[in-house]
């Protein structure tokens, strides 16, 4: 499985997931109406949001977290 780790104006950076990590995730943490912190990568289980300003989406196909 190949997941996106960074998505910038210069293009995307990907990572081949290690054995046992068969999901990609994208985590959006809303700081304010102008700024959102985004984290992407591989995971074994889909993480749960830690607060109401955070959303997490998991998927299992190549680059699905772009």
UniProtKB/Swiss-Prot annotation:
Q: Does the keyword Repeat apply?
A: no
Q: Where in the cell is it found?
A: Secreted
- Could you give one GO CC term from the UniProt record? extracellular region
Outcome of substituting residue 15 to E: In AncTx5; 3-4-fold increase in inhibition potency on alpha-2A adrenergic receptor and D3 dopamine receptor, 28-fold increase in inhibition potency on alpha-2B adrenergic receptor, and 10-fold increase in inhibition potency on ADRA2C adrenergic receptor
Q: List the disulfide bonds in this chain.
A: 3-24, 17-42, 46-58, 59-64
Extra information: Negative results: does not show interaction with adrenergic receptors (ADRA1A, ADRA1B, ADRA1D, ADRB1, ADRB2), dopaminergic receptors (DRD1, DRD2, DRD4, DRD5), histaminic receptors (HRH1, HRH3, HRH4), muscarinic receptors (CHRM1, CHRM2, CHRM3, CHRM4, CHRM5), and serotoninergic receptors (HTR1A, HTR2A, HTR2B, HTR2C, HTR5A, HTR6, HTR7).
Report the protein's function: Non-competitive antagonist of alpha-2 adrenergic receptors (ADRA2) in smooth muscles, and partial antagonist of D3 dopamine receptors (DRD3) (inhibits 25% of methylspiperone binding to this receptor). Also shows a low antagonism on D2 dopamine receptors (DRD2) (short isoform). Shows high affinity to adrenergic receptors (Ki=14 nM (ADRA2A), Ki=73 nM (ADRA2B), and Ki=38 nM (ADRA2C)). Increases heart rate and blood catecholamine concentrations.
What protein name applies here? Rho-elapitoxin-Da1b
Native source organism of the sequence = Dendroaspis angusticeps
């Amino acid at each position: 499985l190949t997941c996106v780790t960074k998505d910038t104006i210069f293009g995307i950076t990907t990572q081949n997931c290690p054995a046992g990590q068969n999901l990609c995730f994208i985590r959006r943490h809303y700081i304010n109406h102008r700024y959102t912190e985004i984290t992407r990568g591989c995971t074994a289980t889909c993480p749960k949001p830690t607060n109401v300003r955070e959303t997490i989406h998991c998927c299992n196909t190549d680059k699905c977290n772009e």
